[in-house]
C-alpha cells in the first residue's frame, strides 16, 4: 500500500479501474472509488469511522476534504459519505457525512454537513453552506450560507453537469497517459 492509500485498522481503500489519485492526496480506510474517479492534488478522504463511497466519473478537486460521522448514542447509525456518479466537487470543498446524488456540481469552497442530502441534478453555488440534515431538491440551483433554493436549472445547465464530469474524466485520462500521475 502506498503513502497515498493508507489502511485504517483492517479497512483498506478499494479502487476501481482508470482511477487517478494525485500523489499529494491521501485516501484512508474504508473508501470505495468507482471507475474513472479523479482525485486531484491535496485532497484528503478519511473512511476511518464509517465508509466513503464515490461513484463513477466523479471528480474531487484540489484541496477538498471528505470525512464521515462515527456511530454513537447520539447518532446510532453514524453518517457515511456517499457521492453518486458524474459529480463535480469543486476546489476546497468540505463534505462531512452527507449524501450526494448523480450529476451534481458542488461549487468551490462549499461546506456540506452531516445528514445533508443532495438529490440528482443539483448545482450548489460557490461558498455555500448546506446545514445538517438539509435536503436539496432535484433540478435546482442553490446558493448561500445557509443555502436557499434560487431557481430551477435550465436544460442547458443540466446538460452542463454531465459535461463537467466528462471533461474531468478526459483531463484525468490525459494526466494518466502522459505519466504525470499513476493509478494506485
UniProtKB/Swiss-Prot annotation:
Which CDD domains does its entry note? Answer: LbH_gamma_CA_like (cd04645)
Q: Which domain of life is it from?
A: Bacteria
Q: Name one GO molecular function term.
A: zinc ion binding
Q: Signal sequence: where?
A: none
Q: What Gene Ontology cellular-component terms does the record carry?
A: cytosol; protein-containing complex
Q: Which Gene3D superfamilies match?
A: Hexapeptide repeat proteins (2.160.10.10)
* InterPro entries associated with the record: Hexapep, LbH_gamma_CA-like, Transf_Hexapept/Carb_Anhydrase, Trimer_LpxA-like_sf
Q: Which family does it belong to?
A: Belongs to the gamma-class carbonic anhydrase family.
Q: What is this protein called?
A: Protein YrdA
Q: Which organism is it from?
A: Escherichia coli (strain K12)
Organism phylogeny = Bacteria, Pseudomonadati, Pseudomonadota, Gammaproteobacteria, Enterobacterales
* Gene encoding the protein: yrdA
Amino acid at each position: 500500500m502506498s503513502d497515498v492509500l493508507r489502511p485504517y485498522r483492517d479497512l483498506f481503500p478499494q479502487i476501481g479501474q482508470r482511477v487517478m489519485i494525485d500523489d499529494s492526496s491521501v485516501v484512508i480506510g474504508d473508501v470505495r472509488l468507482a471507475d474513472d474517479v479523479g482525485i486531484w492534488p491535496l485532497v484528503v478522504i478519511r473512511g476511518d469511522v464509517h465508509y466513503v463511497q464515490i461513484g463513477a466519473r466523479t471528480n474531487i478537486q484540489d484541496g477538498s476534504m471528505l470525512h464521515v460521522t462515527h456511530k454513537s448514542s447520539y447518532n446510532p447509525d453514524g453518517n457515511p459519505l456517499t457521492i453518486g456518479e458524474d459529480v463535480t466537487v469543486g476546489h476546497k470543498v468540505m463534505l462531512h457525512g452527507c449524501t450526494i446524488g448523480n450529476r451534481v456540481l458542488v461549487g468551490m469552497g462549499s461546506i456540506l454537513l452531516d445528514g445533508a442530502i443532495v438529490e440528482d441534478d443539483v448545482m450548489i453555488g460557490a461558498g455555500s453552506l448546506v446545514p445538517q440534515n438539509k435536503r436539496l431538491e432535484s433540478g435546482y440551483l442553490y446558493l448561500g450560507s445557509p443555502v436557499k433554493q434560487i431557481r430551477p436549472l435550465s436544460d442547458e445547465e443540466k446538460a452542463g453537469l454531465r459535461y463537467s464530469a466528462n471533461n474531468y474524466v478526459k483531463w484525468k485520462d490525459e494526466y494518466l497517459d502522459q505519466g504525470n500521475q499513476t493509478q494506485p
